[in-house]
């Protein structure tokens, strides 16, 4: 007997009910460096987090020879934020960013300022909190949370909000 999967909305609503409601803390002291050097190999697979996410999110990913077959040279992204198909080519002007679904600046003012560095590094490199997306959409978002910004693709709004709630619940952010 297989149990039916619970709809994501039910789980997200339950998690949202459990999130604390508090005012944002000051942004004083925030800097990207508070979350460790970008794109570490936190899972010790020989690949940095950026390439792990590109391999996960791109189709037809072509990997560079050597270096643990980690470095993604090219591929195609079905961008959840815009709904567009985007060709990725390493070295060209960045058309794809890796987005922190819960932006690090937002995490800082909703609890991460008081964390140990190891926990901030974990959040910054957690695949749950990372998506390959259109660079322009990511940069338009900045440090906004789901109350302030939603992806331009309306069919992704619910999944985006649910993912942000899941990250905030996992790390006990507000």
Please identify what each model-predicted range represents.
Residues 81-174:
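Domain-level detector of nuclease and nuclease-like folds
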Residues 12-16, 27, 50-54, 74, ...:
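Extracytoplasmic/secreted envelope proteins and their assembly/folding machinery
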Residues 1-47:
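N-terminal module-boundary/linker segments of secreted carbohydrate-active enzymes
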Residues 5-9, 52, 58, 89-91:
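Short low-complexity stretches enriched in small and charged residues
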Residues 32-76:
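N-terminal carbohydrate-binding/catalytic regions of secreted carbohydrate-active enzymes
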Residues 26, 49-50, 111, 119:
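Glycine-rich, flexible loop/turn motifs
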Residues 19-23, 27, 34, 39, ...:
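Sec/Tat-exported extracytoplasmic proteins
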């Amino acid at each position: 007997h297989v149990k039916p999967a619970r709809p994501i909305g039910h789980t997200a609503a339950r998690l949202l009910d459990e999130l604390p409601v508090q005012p944002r803390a000051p942004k004083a002291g925030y800097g990207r460096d508070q979350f460790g050097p970008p794109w570490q190999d936190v899972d010790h697979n020989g690949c940095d987090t950026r390439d792990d996410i590109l391999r996960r999110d791109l189709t037809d990913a072509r990997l560079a020879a050597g270096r643990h077959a980690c470095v993604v040279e090219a591929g195609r992204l079905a961008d959840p934020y815009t709904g567009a198909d985007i060709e990725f080519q390493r070295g060209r002007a960045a058309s794809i960013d890796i987005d922190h679904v819960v932006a690090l600046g937002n995490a800082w003012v909703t609890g991460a300022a008081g964390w140990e560095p190891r926990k901030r590094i974990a959040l910054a490199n957690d695949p749950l909190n990372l998506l390959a997306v259109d660079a322009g959409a990511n940069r338009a978002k900045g440090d906004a949370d789901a109350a302030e910004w939603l992806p331009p693709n309306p069919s992704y709004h619910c999944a985006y909000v649910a993912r942000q709630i899941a990250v905030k619940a996992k790390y006990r952010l507000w």
